[in-house]
Structures are given as structure tokens and as C-alpha cells.
Amino acid sequence: MSFQEVWEKEPMKKPRIQKVTVNFGVGEAGDRLTIGAKVIEELTGQSPVRTLAKQTNPAFGIRKKLPIGLKVTLRGKNAEEFLGNAFSAFKTCGKVLYASSFDQVGNFSFGVPEHIDFPGQKYDPSIGIYGMDICVTFEKSGYRVKSRKVKRSHIPKKHLVTKDEAIEYIQAKFDTEVVRE
């Protein structure tokens, strides 16, 4: 029995996207960071959070607690819309998604090297080109028992999202091919 048939019979077993995290590693504070914030806000529709350097690196001119990156967490419909655009940008730059990108509980990450690959984006010399890492986290219905405050419990292994389920979901929902080595 395929995953699609199981999901139709038992909707609680169908995985869903919990969140999509978009990371911009600019590497320096200042103008590039503020321009990057405008770019990521235009792509996602949300204002980003600045990430701080964890340690000092004099070779790159980075001090501890200096803002050097940006991140945005998307949930619900916004996450699915952004992920659809991200997959089209990913295909545009000639990349493929490998099964080795998925972990054992179905989460995966991929990178888009240029923000201008997204639909509707044009190159502007004053902005430059920014790349980003996109991390997708999956869950199933009932995962709230793991994170709630009262009567917290663990998720049984049979209810965790598997790597194969996540691959099947991505292929069906976003019409994206996942290459198995």
C-alpha cells in the first residue's frame, strides 16, 4: 500500500510542513545586511531577525555578538507558497534535490545560490546577489503533545515522519523530483 492510500484512509498519518526557515548568511554588518533584510522581506513577506556572531574572527573582521546574518521562519500557507517559489528557483539554477538531503525524521535543507532565480526578481547592481539556505521541518497531527506545557509526552516511533514519507509528500505536493543515489 502506497503512502497516498494510507494518507487517504488515515488523515492523522499525513505529514505536513511545520515550518520553513530561511537563512541569509551575509557575513558582515552594515549596508549589505540592511539590503539583505530588504531582499528577504520582499521574498518572504515577513521582516527578518538578525543573527549574531558566536565568536570573534579577526581574519574576517567579525566580532562576537556582531549581526552577520538574517533568518525568517514561515509557517502555514506562507511557508507552502514560499517553498513553491523556492523549488522553482532551485530548478531554474539547474540543481536537483537528493535523498541524502533528508534526515531520518523527514526534515531537509537545500540552498538557492542567487535570489534573482526566484520568480519576479530582477538583477539590480546596487543590491547585488544574495544566496540563502532553506530548511524545511515536517510534523504529523498530534505532535503538539511533545511541546505543550501540561501533560507533555513523547511521540511514538510509528507516528514520526519518515524519510520516505517526506520524499513522497514533496514529490506529490510540489512536483519536484528527488534523486535517490
UniProtKB/Swiss-Prot annotation:
One GO molecular-function annotation for this sequence? structural constituent of ribosome
Report which residue ranges the record marks as coiled coil: none
Q: Show the Pfam families listed in the entry.
A: Ribosomal_L5, Ribosomal_L5_C
- HAMAP family given for it? Ribosomal_uL5_A
State the family it belongs to.
Answer: Belongs to the universal ribosomal protein uL5 family.
SUBUNIT field: Part of the 50S ribosomal subunit; contacts the 5S rRNA and probably tRNA. Forms a bridge to the 30S subunit in the 70S ribosome.
Question: What's the protein here called?
Answer: Large ribosomal subunit protein uL5
